[in-house]
Amino acid sequence: MPILQNVLLQASKDSVFLTTTNLDLGINCCVKAEVEKEGTVTLPVRELSKIVRELADIEVDVETSDGTKVSISTRGSTFNLVGMDSKEYPPLPGLEESDSFTINRECLLEMLKSVSYAQSVNEERYMLKGVFFKKESTDLSLVATDGRRLAVATKELTISENDGNCEFILPSITVNELEKLPQIGNTILLSYTDRQVQIELNVSEQTYENQGFRGSIKLISKVVEGKYPNFKQVIPKDNFKSAMVERELMLECVSRASLIADERITLRIKNKEMEITGQSILGDACENMPIDYEGEEATVSFNPKFIQDPLRCVKKDNITLEFRDDMSPGVFKINPKEKEQANLLCVVMPIRTD
């Protein structure tokens, strides 16, 4: 449907409502405006976004004619766009008899950031192309995996509209749009059915005055059909070696060692020190860093990207690395003391050495 390349603008009273959809995901928001004449129009969203992005942060005049032609003007600039008849624009679906729960906006976005990198990009494994939400009473877990690594973020909800359990898979495209939400409002309301999820970011009065948003920003998305695999079976329960490492330093060392590495780097863990090496037919690199570890020496190899991704996505200075041997998965863990932060873990499959 060509009209799905457009955004629907509806001017009414002192507001303009903006809606866009691809039939699987819909987004709706409202901004304040001085409306001289009510009406609706659809415009190509890509071109409109480019124009708005380049305009100065000042008032913009928008005029329509014939229901499809629009003139956008501001100080010294005028743009004319041709849209399509708004009557052809499909309405966003509503959720009926849905359950819901509330979560802090910043916490949810941090949890998503902590796991979304592990989503699968394999079209054949469609159930893994998204983030799995699992709510048990007041505990919420977000999970992503591509079969070679697993990321889990868990948080105890402090505000809950419903104490029931639920689980659904949010598609990767919805996750990407959710991560782009503006940093406004304090809470997000998630309403869900067996087939759809509505994510509503409430806008405060202060935000209305400062940025022009009003009401709420809503995302309505279909969920991925199918049952998510039992991720708890993947988490090792018998790792008996544990080292405390400085996150930023380890990220720097892994990044430098990977410059020479092929598809793997090797961690040699010994008393108070970790040696990180990478090699290829072109040469080799070696990094040494202090760690908090006392025990038998161990060596394990990983894909460097699978280490870099979780290290980049957390704020905590120190993390725990759990391991057993060169044939077993490694586990990166963060258990923050602050209640506002989520517990995080990332399971990474090793690369076998010859």
Each language-model region and where it sits:
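Structural preference for solvent-exposed beta-strand-turn elements
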Residues: M1-D354
